[in-house]
Amino acid sequence: MSVPRIDGETSLVGLIGHPVSHSLSPQMHNASFAALGLNYVYVPLDVPPEELEAGVRGLRALGFRGFNVTMPHKERVCALVDRLDEAARISGAVNTVAVEEDGSLLGMNTDGSGFLLACREAGVEPSGRVALVAGAGGAAAAVAVALLRAGLSELRIANRTPGRALGLRERLGGLGGRVEVFPLSGLAEAAGGADILVNATYLGMRAGDPLPFPEELLRPGVAVCDAVYRPGKSTALVRAARRRGLAAVPGELMLLYQGVEAQRAWTGVDPDVGAMRRALSGEG
């Protein structure tokens, strides 16, 4: 990938989170900008929680065209933008912000649509199926919205704090499909009869993390999706699923497709998906 051209006309986009040093988003987006000849640059910005409000104000003041939002800021950013798209409003989480022509901030959620595109590339179709999502934070909420919109028959949410999962279930009302809540201690019960297992927790970000789903739950015919990715290697969950011959949707694929949707919102141009994919695989 060539070094981005930076001059007085360069449009700025980026990523805010804490931490951001592990992120592959800069490589991915800058590869597409270079391939398309767009005068944009994407920069990672480590913004601690206590500086989030000031950080968002600063990005607007500095003329950024948009930015991604990652953990732990996805939910708090909802209150810092001017309006939300439907996916962000229902999920209560923002992963992409676009600066509109009048300078207002549109909070979007492309995690869910990216998740669905990744599933379908891997041959996983949610319609009419039963899915178990571990986690009830921003990523889990976006995935839940996307699954129900895609015709899922039953969604099960397992979370360490049941109150948060119950709040998510309430927000999902009206999207169709049955929604049940389980404590993490009831993970085995929740997984019974599930066709799709989705990890939307932090587990897997660090080497040595326990599997979010015990190996005995990785039954024949189950599809496994991991929202977590580790630069340069598959997560333990994805490796375990593949060893058993199961369909596995890695976090890198979800990252790719949510990024495609985000970049299109910033530039109004279809991204170079091939360049983005090569950058994620280390070939760019």
From Swiss-Prot:
It comes from Rubrobacter xylanophilus (strain DSM 9941 / JCM 11954 / NBRC 16129 / PRD-1). GO terms for biological process: amino acid biosynthetic process; aromatic amino acid family biosynthetic process; chorismate biosynthetic process; shikimate metabolic process. Belongs to the shikimate dehydrogenase family. Homodimer. Coiled coil: none annotated. Shikimate binds at S23, L24, S25, T70, N95, D111, Y229. Pathway: Metabolic intermediate biosynthesis; chorismate biosynthesis; chorismate from D-erythrose 4-phosphate and phosphoenolpyruvate: step 4/7. It holds the Pfam family SDH_C. Its EC number is 1.1.1.25. This is Shikimate dehydrogenase (NADP(+)). The active site is at K74 (proton acceptor). GO terms for molecular function: NADP binding; shikimate 3-dehydrogenase (NADP+) activity. It catalyses: shikimate + NADP(+) = 3-dehydroshikimate + NADPH + H(+). Involved in the biosynthesis of the chorismate, which leads to the biosynthesis of aromatic amino acids. Catalyzes the reversible NADPH linked reduction of 3-dehydroshikimate (DHSA) to yield shikimate (SA). It is an enzyme of class 1 (oxidoreductase). It comes from the Bacteria. NADP(+) binds at E86, G135, A136, G137, G138, A139, N159, R160, T161, P162, G163, R164, A227, G251. Keywords: Amino-acid biosynthesis, Aromatic amino acid biosynthesis, NADP, Oxidoreductase.
